[in-house]
């Protein structure tokens, strides 16, 4: 286990390992991003990235096939794209929203170098990063009061272990968003209009949806988890083209606001974290019920 000490001057909001688990990016209310090299239980700070004018909420590593690249999202309404070359990190591109950018995540590599952003201005944007630092954004209104989180669907369809035929993943892109309207929304890319159109609106929460996560599992069902300020987590499932079904992760509310949901790489274990400073792990049993798989206390 690697413990990062007092390297930031304020709260740390996100910490993400790169594809190989060799580098860690952290971001903080001190307006900086820090890059660490990880070697076993040891770590070394190698770079501090500055430029944001507000708290940095989230960071995301691009797949290494696109280079050594991270994106950062900040309260200042900006998304920065940073690239490392010859040991030096530089800010190579920027993307602007009209309010805090709360979520930023690179797409699965099959979709290409696409960046998904959710903002308090109510909009969600998908930014295509091009060589030379140029970016082309598709922006659409998603949640009237503000968008808090967004997540990519896996590139293969549920029920299949293969990728889309002819590799045309761009024709099958779907995303899920969560917002301050208490709703979870599923969007699909429409090649004819070159934008994202609403495919499904899922209602079930009674307060802001703080986080959404689409499981990478491509077996019999699609899974989406949503975490809310109403102290609940809902797992939404879909088999084939059937309607989405909702199920509370547990019948009683969590002790505090639920801030974050995250699926394991295999897509079958769900981690839940909230205001009670605990991380709980959950797994679906053979009857479709969700059972506790452990607790991590801070």
Swiss-Prot record:
Protein's cellular compartments: Cytoplasmic vesicle, COPII-coated vesicle membrane; Endoplasmic reticulum membrane; Nucleus, Nuclear pore complex
Where does the source fall among the domains of life? Eukaryota
SMART domains per the UniProt record, alphabetical: WD40
Q: Which InterPro entries match?
A: Sec13/Seh1_fam, WD40/YVTN_repeat-like_dom_sf, WD40_repeat_dom_sf, WD40_rpt
- Gene Ontology MF terms: structural molecule activity
A Pfam short name: WD40
Q: Which residues form the WD repeats?
A: 7-46, 51-92, 96-139, 142-197, 204-246, 253-292
Q: Name one GO biological process term.
A: protein import into nucleus
Q: Which GO terms describe its cellular component?
A: COPII vesicle coat; endoplasmic reticulum membrane; GATOR2 complex; nuclear pore outer ring
Q: How does it sit in the bilayer?
A: Peripheral membrane protein
SUPFAM superfamilies assigned:
WD40 repeat-like (SSF50978)
> Where is it predominantly found?
membrane
Q: Which keywords does this Swiss-Prot/TrEMBL entry list?
A: Cytoplasmic vesicle, Endoplasmic reticulum, ER-Golgi transport, Membrane, mRNA transport, Nuclear pore complex, Nucleus, Protein transport, Repeat, Translocation, Transport, WD repeat
Q: Which family does it belong to?
A: Belongs to the WD repeat SEC13 family.
Q: What does the UniProt record say this protein does? A: Component of the coat protein complex II (COPII) which promotes the formation of transport vesicles from the endoplasmic reticulum (ER). The coat has two main functions, the physical deformation of the endoplasmic reticulum membrane into vesicles and the selection of cargo molecules. It also functions as a component of the nuclear pore complex (NPC). NPC components, collectively referred to as nucleoporins (NUPs), can play the role of both NPC structural components and of docking or interaction partners for transiently associated nuclear transport factors.
Subunit text: The COPII coat is composed of at least 5 proteins: the SEC23/24 complex, the SEC13/31 complex, and the protein SAR1. Component of the nuclear pore complex (NPC). NPC constitutes the exclusive means of nucleocytoplasmic transport. NPCs allow the passive diffusion of ions and small molecules and the active, nuclear transport receptor-mediated bidirectional transport of macromolecules such as proteins, RNAs, ribonucleoparticles (RNPs), and ribosomal subunits across the nuclear envelope. Due to its 8-fold rotational symmetry, all subunits are present with 8 copies or multiples thereof.
Q: What is this protein's name?
A: Protein transport protein SEC13
**Species this protein is from:** Yarrowia lipolytica (strain CLIB 122 / E 150) (Yeast)
Phylogenetic classification of the source organism = Eukaryota, Fungi, Dikarya, Ascomycota, Saccharomycotina
